[in-house]
């Protein structure tokens, strides 16, 4: 059996640019890509916490240390500057691999300040 698992996640980053006329994609600070293990040109899903929209695109690198999250092209209709989003990538693997898999998660606050990274998502309690 093949399973699709969360590979990397940028949790609650703030959109810094939305450029409708750029070629497409989402430009992401290279430091953020590294923290989540997301590669340039990799497919990503973006979930907009601010407006509930969910969409797919691909990642491109923004300048390291810039804190840029730029939603580009048609996707700019789905996010505005200041929106809080979650960016995720996924990987497929065998059932056996999936049982010991741990995603790369980076947590953000404020103006895209990375607060911590983790190799798991906390258990939700009642």
Curated annotation (Swiss-Prot):
Task: Give a GO molecular function annotation for the protein.
Answer: aspartate 1-decarboxylase activity
Q: How is it modified after translation?
A: Is synthesized initially as an inactive proenzyme, which is activated by self-cleavage at a specific serine bond to produce a beta-subunit with a hydroxyl group at its C-terminus and an alpha-subunit with a pyruvoyl group at its N-terminus.
Q: Could you list the residue ranges that cross the membrane? A: none
A Pfam match is Asp_decarbox
Describe cofactor binding as the record notes it: Binds 1 pyruvoyl group covalently per subunit.
What is the annotated localization of this protein?
Cytoplasm
Q: What is its main location?
A: cytoplasm
InterPro entries recorded for this chain? Asp_de-COase-like_dom_sf, Asp_decarbox
Q: Could you tell me the EC number(s) of this protein? A: 4.1.1.11
Its GO CC terms are:
cytosol
- Binding site residues for substrate: 57, 73-75
The Pyruvic acid (Ser) modification is found at 25
Could you tell me the keywords of this UniProt record? Autocatalytic cleavage, Cytoplasm, Decarboxylase, Lyase, Pantothenate biosynthesis, Pyruvate, Schiff base, Zymogen
Q: Describe the function of this protein.
A: Catalyzes the pyruvoyl-dependent decarboxylation of aspartate to produce beta-alanine.
Protein family per UniProt: Belongs to the PanD family.
Q: Which NCBIfam families match?
A: panD (TIGR00223)
Query: What is the protein name given in its UniProt record?
Result: Aspartate 1-decarboxylase
The scientific name of the source species is: Salmonella arizonae (strain ATCC BAA-731 / CDC346-86 / RSK2980)
Q: What is the lineage of its organism?
A: Bacteria, Pseudomonadati, Pseudomonadota, Gammaproteobacteria, Enterobacterales
